[in-house]
Design a protein with these regions (language model features):
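All-alpha RGS (Regulator of G-protein Signaling) helical domain and cognate RGS-like helical scaffolds
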Residues: 1-138
């Protein structure tokens, strides 16, 4: 996978995560709302970084879809927490591809994004995975 393709895939994943956190925010329990808001803002910031990176690589940033399918129905706070963990796992998987496809500063940035997503996933899930970013590949 080229650096441009991997960056576009990461951008698409961030678009989906921003959408997903909109759903999470609507169902999350009040005591976890600040955590959901912080994650939403982190994904928005990463999305902007990736848009610039795509342009720097000579591409046109992939646009966000109007809506995204969710992996399951989110009808209560527990479902919102579960969705947040899934979103982070998916983003981590895409960032693991970006780490493999890039080098230098871009690789360091992708590794930092992978680490941040893995930490958020652990916080949402309450447990970790052996190899963050590879759970989606299993």
């Amino acid at each position: 996978m080229s650096a441009l393709d991997a960056t576009q895939a990461a951008l698409a994943a961030e678009h989906a995560a921003v959408y997903g956190y909109g759903v999470v925010g609507g169902r999350i329990a009040p005591e976890r709302r600040a955590e959901a808001t912080a994650a939403y803002e982190a994904h928005r910031a990463r999305r902007e970084v990736l848009r610039r990176a795509v342009r720097d690589l000579g591409g046109a940033p992939v646009a966000a879809a109007a809506a995204y399918g969710l992996p399951f129905r989110v009808g209560d706070p527990a479902g919102a927490v579960r969705l947040a963990a899934v979103l982070e796992d998916r983003v981590a998987g895409v960032y693991s591809d970006l780490v493999r496809a890039t080098e230098g500063p871009a690789r360091r940035e992708a590794a930092a994004a992978l680490r941040e997503a893995a930490v958020r996933a652990v916080r949402w899930r309450g447990g970790d995975v052996t190899f963050p970013g590879l759970a989606e590949r299993a």
